[in-house]
Swiss-Prot record:
Forms part of the ribosomal stalk which helps the ribosome interact with GTP-bound translation factors. Keywords: Methylation, Ribonucleoprotein, Ribosomal protein, RNA-binding, rRNA-binding. One or more lysine residues are methylated. Belongs to the universal ribosomal protein uL11 family. The gene is rplK. GO terms for biological process: translation. HAMAP family: Ribosomal_uL11. One of its GO terms (cellular component) is cytosolic large ribosomal subunit. One of its GO terms (molecular function) is large ribosomal subunit rRNA binding. The keyword rRNA-binding applies. PANTHER family: 60S RIBOSOMAL PROTEIN L12, LARGE RIBOSOMAL SUBUNIT PROTEIN UL11M. This is Large ribosomal subunit protein uL11. InterPro entries: Ribosomal_uL11, Ribosomal_uL11_bac-typ, Ribosomal_uL11_C, Ribosomal_uL11_C_sf, Ribosomal_uL11_CS, Ribosomal_uL11_N, Ribosomal_uL11_N_sf.
Length: 140
């Protein structure tokens, strides 16, 4: 028989830098799971991606055990890294903070493909292009 799911917690944590301090401690502690166990396992899985934010979806069961999956970094972070900016535009419809190429867009879309609700790479590119537009990043 399958375990009964108690909660699903979604967190965005810097890769390789999970520790029991907030926001991880309070989010997981209220469900009674071993926070250090999660932090060690997360840091091992994300050791190769240090410097990026890696979302984790933690499934907590009634017997206080847990499983988690790591996702790809947020599209906004990948776009900021590709464009070489620290933040998006405050007024994206009026001012452009950076320009990225179609090649960079395709590369980001291929990385994000497994987490996006897109059938093909062109659909994924359109989703990422919309995110770029809302950040004030122009695609040429």
């Amino acid at each position: 028989m399958a375990k009964k799911v108690k909660a699903i917690v979604k967190l965005q944590i810097p890769a390789g830098k999970a520790n029991p301090a907030p926001p991880i401690g309070p989010a997981l502690g209220q469900h009674g799971i071993n926070i250090m166990g999660f932090c060690k396992e997360y840091n091992e899985r994300t050791a190769s991606m240090v410097g990026t934010i890696v979302p984790a979806e933690i499934t907590i069961y009634d017997d206080r055990s847990f499983t988690f999956i790591t996702k790809t970094p947020p599209a906004a972070d990948l776009l900021k890294k590709a464009a070489g900016v620290t933040s998006g535009s405050g007024t994206p419809s009026k001012s452009v903070v950076a320009v990225i190429s179609k090649g960079q867009l395709r590369e980001i879309a291929s990385v994000k493909m497994k987490d996006l609700n897109a059938v093909d790479i062109e659909g994924a590119e359109r989703i990422i292009e919309g995110t770029a537009r809302s950040m004030g990043i122009k695609v040429e």
